[in-house]
Every structure is written in structure tokens, then in C-alpha cells.
Amino acid sequence: MSGDVHALAATGDQIDVTATKHAERSDPEAVEIKVVPSDEGVTICAVYPTPRRAREPNECTTGDHWSSSTEDNDVVVDFEVRVPAGVKFYGHTVNGKVEVEHLGADVWAYTVNGSVRVSTSGYAEATTVNGSITAQMGRADWPDAVEFTTVNGGITLDLPANLSAEVRATTVNGEVTSDFPLLVTGRFGPRRFHGTIGQGGRELKLSTVNGSIRLRKTT
């Protein structure tokens, strides 16, 4: 799947989704926008034509797994989603960025080739491969662990001043900095640390290869 995902706060209690398709060679009409409701919410996908050699058909399903092989199809589908306050958001693309602005609930954002930017009053989790991650979270009471991972890009988190967490942060070509006082466990280095912020407890995992990691305190 190719295209950006842009989520922003709705003014009312209705979810509004706009999908914009464009291409140079392939037929945009061949890419279907599917809506799949479930007990947990609604899943909206761009479903590309299934390639002849695909092992399974392209389809839109709920949950973390669905098949979406595009082969040489160059259709790009950009989604704009207006999300009401209190509604959790899960955004997933492959070739594109994910931008989430001023939402009022928890956020999960995933891409492969693209950056991730999140701003929410809840907590968040994000993964990419080629791109940076920037996240501002209004809550720091996630139940178990949250993780932010990339390979080529930095990670910058803005977190509440009352944060308590067990932090594991690693980078290869970069540095790790924190505005929060840290009680370090084991060896501390500029590229790796395991430490406690506040009372500890819940886990915060941060990992990159080429990029720096920054924990910033919000007021």
C-alpha cells in the first residue's frame, strides 16, 4: 500500500474519512476502498487488485494482519481521517507517512517507508523502518509497555512531567538524551541505557540504528 495517512480531531462525534487516489500508469478505479465493521470498531482499507502470483488474495480484515500485495501497481491512496474525541486510532501504511494531530485518545501508527508524527492526549506507539518518529503524549499510564522503533531515523518523545517508567533505549549511530532524571541499571553509555524514571513500573522501549533518541519533558 502506498499513500499517506493523516488523522486529525473531528469537531463532532462522527468519523469522517476521505480517500484520494492518484496514479501515473495504473487505474485508480481498480483500487477499492473497503469498510469492515467489527465489535471493536471499524477498519477502512485500500484494497489493491490481487497480483497473479500472490499466495493469498488481497483483502481488508480486522486485526493486525491483512494481505496487501501491490506488485507494480503505482496507485497512491492518501487517507484523511477526522476522529472524534475518545476514539482510539490505528493508522497503517507501507510507503507513506503517518501524521496524527491533536487526537483525544490512544494512537498506534505504523509504516515502513515514511516518517511518523503523533500528537495526542492519550498514549501512543509507533513503528517505521525508513523515517523518523516524533510523538507528543498527554498520558503516561499505559498498562504494560509501549514501543517506538525505527532503523533509519531519530526518535523524539514529549512526555508528561509525572512520567514513571522503566526505559530501555538503544541506538547504533546516534546518542540518547533525556530531560528526566534517570536511575541507571547496569552500564550507561551514550548509545544505550536501561534506567528508571520516577517510580518505574510500566515499560518504555525505544530503538533505532541510525539516529538519536530524545526524551523531552512537557509542562
Give the predicted meaning of each segment.
Residues 1-219:
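Intrinsically disordered, low-complexity terminal regions
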